[in-house]
Structures are given as C-alpha cells and as structure tokens.
Amino acid sequence: MSMNEQMNHAEENILHTYNRFPVMFDHGEGCYLYDTEGKKYLDFAAGIAVNSLGYHYPGYDEALKSQIDKLTHISNLYYNEPMSEAGEKLVKASGLSKAFFTNSGTEAIEGALKAARKYAYTKYGKEAGKYEIIAMNHSFHGRSMGALSVTGTEHYREPFLSLIHI
C-alpha cells in the first residue's frame, strides 16, 4: 500500500486524535526507524512514552519471544514470576519500598496523582487541605480526566473543561 493509500485508509478507519506526520515506518533497529522507502530516522521519541525500548536490541527480542510462549499478559490480580522479579529489581534500583505496575502511561499518571493525594491525606489529614498538585506549563500527561487536569497545554484541556480540580 502506498503512503497516500495508507494515509487515506487510516483516515477512513481510525478516529482522529492526533495530527500525524506524513511518514510510514516499516521497521526499526536499535535507536533508528526506517520508512517504507528505506530512509533512516533517529527515533528521538524512543518508541512512545512508556514504551521506550528501542528496536531489536540483543537479548530483548529473545526475552519477549520466550515470555510470549508462556504468558503474553495477565492481570495483576494474579501472581506471576516475571512481575515479582521485575518488582524486586525496581525496588532495589530505586530505593523505594514497592513497585507499581500499570498498563499505560495514563494509568501511571493517575496512580501518581492518587498516591500523592493519599500520602498528604495520611500524613496531614483531610482538614489540612493539602491536595494541590504542581504541574509544568506546556506539558502533556495523557487523555484521562485526571491526566488532562495536570496537562499544562491549553488546547489539550479546553475541549474537556471543566476538569478535575487539582
């Protein structure tokens, strides 16, 4: 399918949530992406947000293939060895006491907002009124109502006002 045919096909079938760049990628290697014409691009976005894994690093593909043969995804309502092992590594590397796993960056932002509010509530009590969250201007944190509430870019926020008071 040509680039123009692919663009038209996508516009017909996919909800327009972002302005897309007129490039169609075919594959990646390391930190590079290649379009359908073979042009090489340095992937400054490193994939996308929470999935900044690069492309085909030694050992990475093999580890994914091995895990896919066992479990591709399982809810955190159940125990599984890879999650426990990853949690242990994160705790040791971060110095924190627990790891928190989510399925997306938006869930991570929502979890962080809730953790900050719960911390303030537990430490200072409801009456202290410590519920405000500091956010950066010109930021983007996701499309959920909580994430939009701390997004500092007005054109993302405006269509969904009034947001959650942060």
Which stretches of residues belong to each language-model region?
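Active-site-adjacent loop/helix segments that line or gate small-molecule/cofactor pockets in enzymes
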Residues: 1-29
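Active-site and channel-lining beta-strand-loop segments
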Residues: 23-43
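Glycine-rich loop-to-alpha-helix module at the N-terminal edge of alpha/beta enzyme cores
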Residues: 40-126
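Conserved A3 ("GATE") glycine/threonine-rich loop of ANL adenylate-forming enzymes
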Residues: 106-107, 140-145
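Short acidic, glycine/serine/threonine-rich loops at helix termini
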Residues: 113-114, 143-149
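Conserved PLP-anchoring active-site segment centered on the Schiff-base-forming lysine
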Residues: 119-141, 149
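A glycine-rich helix N-cap at a beta->alpha junction
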Residues: 159-160
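Conserved small/polar residues in nucleotide/adenosyl-binding loops
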Residues: 164-166
